[in-house]
């Protein structure tokens, strides 16, 4: 047995085969059934020519098929690749090509988007289509129905030996806004982000992979990850729970539905609800406030956020509405795994502050640890179990993963300081990226699209604090002439080229943008202009 993620899952499935692993709509799968379906998919992919090292894309909403796709790839020593189903043609084309996809598992409703770019990618000629109730046309050469493929494949666990050195890749936004693949070893991601065999996170990780079955909880934790599996934090939560013998309750496909989530919490006796910051917390709170007698959520122990931090306002509303429940902020990144967490049972009014272990530090410009209580600001960093680098991007790898005095550190780009008690206070991204509802938006990418509009002479894109989304994307524009651009024109221009969350929500027109002699935009000035304009619009 190794630290390969498939090996680890199989050991848990053999320990609690009849325990419920996944609840997804009407489908309820035990660990044995999830294992069998994953085996069938793996054998089918192998028959299609997928082998060790090949990349298999997953363009799916949350469902058992997403987990089956990941496990099937791991069983073959192949690599599952997360695909953001909100991407439009240009973004999909880049990701499919950059990730070297050899196969794609997708929900039927995404088939037209895939067909629009697949013909340009000769390597991608295998498509497993999961039915989702839509009638979207399937115009993909090499497409086949997912369930039909499973029925015709072997359920046996018959695969070559695997390794903890096998690859795990998760795609995230890059410095240009285009997605970049972060490459991990299985062993490293298991310890950095998936619990390390320590289900209650008390620092008692396993020393050998054979120990994992002994760490399976006698009473399973029931977790509901409302965040999509196409993001790292949701994947990590899912495998953390599976490696502990927990039960995953998955949300219905389609738009985010707060009432449906509360109904699932009640029906399935959910203990842990995991969401993405205020973008999900606010509508959940509003739905519960409107009908607080409707749902019995006494089983709920904690509400956690991954991908975006809760605002103090959201924490206060949750604490008032659900007294005694833990409200947990998670600290981490695709380049570091989980770094720490902060839990409250009441309102939090100060900046995010986290307890971390000795593998996490704040490093100054000389790459020395920032001393506790010094007040100095540095870059958040992690050593030990860190990624290999970025897929096909040696320059970014060298900039993000650095060796300091014989130790390799990951520097994800967050700025922080160390409090007198040793806790880390997070100050924000060192880059210009905007975090809106847990999604990263990079100004340069949006600006490039906007600058192509004939009515825009110059533009800077910034993030402005927003009570629901964390930040909202705002375009500060110098129009070519008065009235040359408005929000409707802007939306129409952006829609075919950008995912919806990247499209600016607000437009602020100015006579001139401030730039340096070298042409660099003054983002601080633009952000303040945008903030004032939005405040005056609601005054």
Where are these regions (language model features)?
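Conserved AMP-binding/adenylate-forming core of the ANL superfamily
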Residues: 2, 18-63, 67, 71, ...
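AMP-binding/adenylate-forming catalytic core of the ANL superfamily
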Residues: 87, 93-96, 104-106, 266, ...
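Conserved AMP-binding/adenylation subdomain of ANL enzymes
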Residues: 190-226, 230-272, 291
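Conserved AMP-binding A3 loop
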Residues: 30-32, 167-203
């Amino acid at each position: 047995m190794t630290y390969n993620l498939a090996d680890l899952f199989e050991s848990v499935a053999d320990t609690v085969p009849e325990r419920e692993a996944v609840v997804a709509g009407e489908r309820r799968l035990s660990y044995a059934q999830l294992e069998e379906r994953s085996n069938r998919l793996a054998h089918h992919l192998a028959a299609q020519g997928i082998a060790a090292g090949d990349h298999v894309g997953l363009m799916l909403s949350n469902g058992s098929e997403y987990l089956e796709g990941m496990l099937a790839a791991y069983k073959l020593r192949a690599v599952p690749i997360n695909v953001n189903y909100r991407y439009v043609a240009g973004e999909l084309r880049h990701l499919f090509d950059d990730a070297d996809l050899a196969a794609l598992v997708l929900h039927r409703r995404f088939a037209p988007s895939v067909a629009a770019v697949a013909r340009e990618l000769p390597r991608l000629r295998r498509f497993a289509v999961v039915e989702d109730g839509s009638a979207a046309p399937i115009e993909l050469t090499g497409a086949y129905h997912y369930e039909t493929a499973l029925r015709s494949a072997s359920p046996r666990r018959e695969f070559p030996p695997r390794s903890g050195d096998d690859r795990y890749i998760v795609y995230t936004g890059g410095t240009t806004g285009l997605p970049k693949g972060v490459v991990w070893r299985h062993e490293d991601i298991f310890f950095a982000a998936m619990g390390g065999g320590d289900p209650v996170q008390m620092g008692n990780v396993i020393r050998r992979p054979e120990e994992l079955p002994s760490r399976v909880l006698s009473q399973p934790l029931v977790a509901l990850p409302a965040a999509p599996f196409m993001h790292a934090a949701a994947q990590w939560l899912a495998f953390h729970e599976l490696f502990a013998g927990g039960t995953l309750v998955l949300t219905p496909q389609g738009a985010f539905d707060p009432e449906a989530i509360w109904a699932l919490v009640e029906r399935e006796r959910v203990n842990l609800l995991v969401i993405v910051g205020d973008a999900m917390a606010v509508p959940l709170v509003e739905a519960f406030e409107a009908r607080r007698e409707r749902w019995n959520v006494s089983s709920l122990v904690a509400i956690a956020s991954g991908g975006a931090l809760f605002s103090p306002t959201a924490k206060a509303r949750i604490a008032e509405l659900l007294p005694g429940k833990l409200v947990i902020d998670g600290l981490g990144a695709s380049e570091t795994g989980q770094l720490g967490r902060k839990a409250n049972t009441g309102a939090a009014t100060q900046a995010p502050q986290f307890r971390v272990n000795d593998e996490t530090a704040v490093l100054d410009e000389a790459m020395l640890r920032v001393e506790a209580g010094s007040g100095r600001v540095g870059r958040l960093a992690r050593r030990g179990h860190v990624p290999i680098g970025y897929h096909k991007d040696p320059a970014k790898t060298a900039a993000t993963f650095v060796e300091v005095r014989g130790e390799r550190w990951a520097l994800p780009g967050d700025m922080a300081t160390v409090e007198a008690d040793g806790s880390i206070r997070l100050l924000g991204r060192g880059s210009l990226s905007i975090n809106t509802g847990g999604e990263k938006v990079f100004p340069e990418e949006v600006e490039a699209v906007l600058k192509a509009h004939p009515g825009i002479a110059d533009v800077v894109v910034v993030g402005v604090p927003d009570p629901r989304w964390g930040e909202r994307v705002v375009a500060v524009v110098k129009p070519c002439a008065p009235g040359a651009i408005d929000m409707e024109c802007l939306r129409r221009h952006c829609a075919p080229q950008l995912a919806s969350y990247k499209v600016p929500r607000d437009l602020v027109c100015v006579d001139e943008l401030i730039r340096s002699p070298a042409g660099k935009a003054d983002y601080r000035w633009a952000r303040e202009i945008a903030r004032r304009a939005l405040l005056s619009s609601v005054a």
